[in-house]
Amino acid sequence: MNENFEMRDFGTYSPEEIIAENLQELFERADVLGEEEIAHLCELAAEIAQGDDLADLLSSLPYYRISEMKPLAGALADHRELLSRSRKLLEARQCMILCRALYEKLKHRENLLSALFPDVEEVLPQAAGRIVYQRSSYANDAYLAFASLLPNARATYAHSFAAACEEVYNGHCEYCILPVENAVEGELIGFAKLIAQFDLKIIAVCDIAGADASRSTRFALLQRNMLPLSDADAMKNGCFRFSLPKESASLVADVLTAANFYGLEFRSANTLPPSEQSLFNLTFDICGGDLYPFLLYLATVAPQYTPIGIYSHIKQKGI
């Protein structure tokens, strides 16, 4: 018996109190094991982080899977399902700790975000600064708000929202503007479908108020690349949005748990209509949270996820 645990006279205890005391002793032992576990995971993170090529390092992150459980005898066999679930929770926790420790080793590396999102599309000189959108009074106000963020912003007009997306997709314009939400309908699924169809990334959003303040519309500024306009602004007043394919539905609960572990606040979730590619779109508030470890976690356990945007929420000019 561990000499650090004092002997107790259980003769005066009720059965419930004895069980509670035994559980408390197990918790204390678990704390010691937990410290050892974290130390080992930090050592593993240090080993992983030794690679020189950051992109190769991130692409080879280990995906920890539960090993096959050995046959259980006696009473334990009756709890196989419960033990299996408990082990999966332990596996998830270890992965979250590992990614947090790995970020501590990598955070001083240059271009960490670029390594996490390596598929950067080159912007042609004639497209740089061009913002395309379908004209309306609301969209004009959104353009003025977004143009204040961009040097040499120039407006270009499209005959439809799909045409605006296509201009960016084909490299003719650097940015486009789409309405993505309003106070009446909530999220506008038709525009979420356009964003997915053309693989565009949200880099800023702005709420445009109408004559009736209750009828505001949220517009998004989008581009082909995932990198935000400003890391600092996005971290202070930003969101992270991504999608998981239908076949990854079982991962949603794990992802929500990890987001909470890293201090990200859940904002919304939706799915595209069944007739389209089935996707779970998830949005988190990243202010005050640890986004980078969460990105490492997603790269490890859900490499099939699709980033939709790391973006800041800007105010309409004059409001």
Where are these regions (language model features)?
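Domain-level signature for soluble enzymes in the chorismate/prephenate branch of the shikimate pathway
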Residues: 2-319
